């Protein structure tokens, strides 16, 4: 590393991709065990190992970028391309759920009663909690933009305030979504409506939790003066991800809650 004559970051061997993959295997297996046998041990183990992996991997990246200076402009450019490609892959991930929803709802089969929502399903009122959730996420999009502008201007106090507001709104959205799930009259096993509704909104909720975690890490890093006005790609990536989550929710709201009801 000391004799390299290029600007690229040659990453040292790391165990975290392997432990991350194993924790993902434990989590998916644990989810199946929870659904079928009501056992949460494997899921808890998977989530614990995943959190430990995330913490240690983030710690290594922060050390390499902030303290060792490995994230040169050319490395940051590569990270930007990587984040853009990741978000594009997420777009296609959600496109699958929208495809399933529209495939089922635009031409409902006789088994569904020939109508949408299917016979016996009482959909949620789109003008109640879903509309509140929409306003919460739109407000969080405004506050994350405020945080970004404050960081670019070197206004640390406003950046921390805006980031804290965004995280609070993200947590509030998650709590509202959980309360909505608790109150629904249908479940994930109630035919194609239940499965498409809970898969699409559930995976979006998971992305909100991931995005909130991402922002919490950025908040802690900002407290420790890790970001400057010209070196803050960690925060920028979190902001891009949060805007993506916002846009997906708008499509979910219009498609599943409003049109689909």
UniProtKB/Swiss-Prot annotation:
Gene giving rise to this polypeptide: MT-CO3
Assembly, per entry: Component of the cytochrome c oxidase (complex IV, CIV), a multisubunit enzyme composed of 14 subunits. The complex is composed of a catalytic core of 3 subunits MT-CO1, MT-CO2 and MT-CO3, encoded in the mitochondrial DNA, and 11 supernumerary subunits COX4I, COX5A, COX5B, COX6A, COX6B, COX6C, COX7A, COX7B, COX7C, COX8 and NDUFA4, which are encoded in the nuclear genome.
Superkingdom assignment: Eukaryota
Family matches, as InterPro entries: Cyt_c/ubiquinol_Oxase_su3, Cyt_c_oxase_su3_dom, Cyt_c_oxidase-like_su3, Cyt_c_oxidase_su3-like_sf, Cyt_c_oxidase_su3_a-hlx
Main location per the UniProt record: mitochondrion
Catalytic activity: 4 Fe(II)-[cytochrome c] + O2 + 8 H(+)(in) = 4 Fe(III)-[cytochrome c] + 2 H2O + 4 H(+)(out)
Record-given protein name: Cytochrome c oxidase subunit 3
GO CC, alphabetical: mitochondrial inner membrane; mitochondrion; respiratory chain complex IV
Residues on Mitochondrial matrix side: 1-15, 67-72, 153-155, 224-232
GO biological process, one term: mitochondrial electron transport, cytochrome c to oxygen
């Amino acid at each position: 590393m000391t004799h390299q004559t290029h600007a690229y970051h040659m990453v040292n061997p790391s165990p975290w991709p392997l432990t991350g993959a194993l924790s993902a295997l434990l989590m998916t297996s644990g989810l199946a065990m929870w659904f079928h046998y009501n056992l949460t041990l494997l899921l808890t183990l998977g989530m614990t190992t995943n959190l430990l992996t995330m913490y240690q991997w983030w710690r290594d990246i922060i050390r390499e970028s902030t303290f060792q200076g490995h994230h040169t402009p050319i490395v940051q450019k590569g990270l930007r391309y990587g984040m853009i490609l990741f978000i594009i892959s997420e777009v296609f991930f959600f496109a699958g759920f929208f495809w399933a929803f529209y495939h089922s709802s635009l031409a409902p089969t006789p088994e569904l009663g020939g109508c949408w929502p299917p016979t016996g399903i009482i959909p949620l009122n789109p003008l109640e909690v879903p509309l509140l959730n929409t306003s919460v996420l739109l407000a969080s999009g405004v506050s994350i933009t405020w945080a970004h502008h404050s960081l670019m201007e070197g206004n640390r106090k406003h950046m921390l305030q805006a980031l804290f507001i965004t995280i609070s709104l993200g947590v509030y959205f998650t709590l509202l979504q959980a309360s909505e799930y608790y109150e629904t009259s249908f479940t994930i096993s109630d035919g194609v409506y239940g499965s498409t509704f809970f898969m699409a909104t559930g995976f979006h909720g998971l992305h909100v939790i991931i995005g909130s975690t991402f922002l919490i890490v950025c908040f802690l890093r900002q407290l420790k003066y890790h970001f400057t006005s010209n070196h803050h790609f960690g925060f920028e990536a979190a902001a891009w991800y949060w805007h993506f989550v916002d846009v997906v929710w708008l499509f979910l709201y219009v498609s599943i809650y409003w049109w689909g009801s």
